[in-house]
């Protein structure tokens, strides 16, 4: 639990600086979007950016004419721009050896075949060379950090995961609300929802709480958790916004959580009740104990 609290304080605290630093951080760089100006209002600063996982996105070209045609020709992760014989820009696989040398362990990533790469650049460059192959199709970035032993998730542990996750989502929103003044961390509609949670005297403060207390608090203060669960769904449902979460859309939340919470993968797998590889809002909310009558698409704001 202490890891969750540390994760919350450090990353939610990053929200104060994040709106102006996104484009400079490789780990949060968008694959297909040109220069970013900051976190969208109401975005979750805790999850890594969706662009890190958009492996199938198309390259884009700006209409601005440049002396170097490659200057405004943007390639997805793992590819770089080169000019062909007719001076036309094209995206080709990047040589992994051309990736910047990693600064530290925090830049390393682990693939779903349990191989550690020096950075996301090295991973995507390698994946690009496998395009069109069965191995390349199955290869994905699993989580941030070097590969480590992930213990099996026991049934008893699986039941505890949503207790901590719900409490964490609530605390992330409250922290954003408290630090929102002048920072546009939340939209006005989101502020109105979170204000009620923040001002409720019965709210359980962030802390290293036993799961028994978290379970009792959810039962006593159930209404406080309805919006945070919907809010997080909306943060992930972005490409496209269709009311379903794909593996790629879940990745920005899964990747930083797996090293700390070994039940992360199994939890999200159990949420997919119909095994269609997508998690609908109803499945997501149900996984967190939200009653069917309280699941409301209008709360995904």
Swiss-Prot record:
Glycosylation site residues: 114
Question: Main site of residence?
Answer: secreted
| Signal sequence annotation | 1-17
The residues the record assigns to binding Ca(2+) are 272, 274, 276, 278, 283
Q: Does the keyword Signal apply?
A: yes
Q: Name one GO biological process term.
A: response to cadmium ion
Q: What is this protein called?
A: SPARC
**Gene (name only):** Sparc
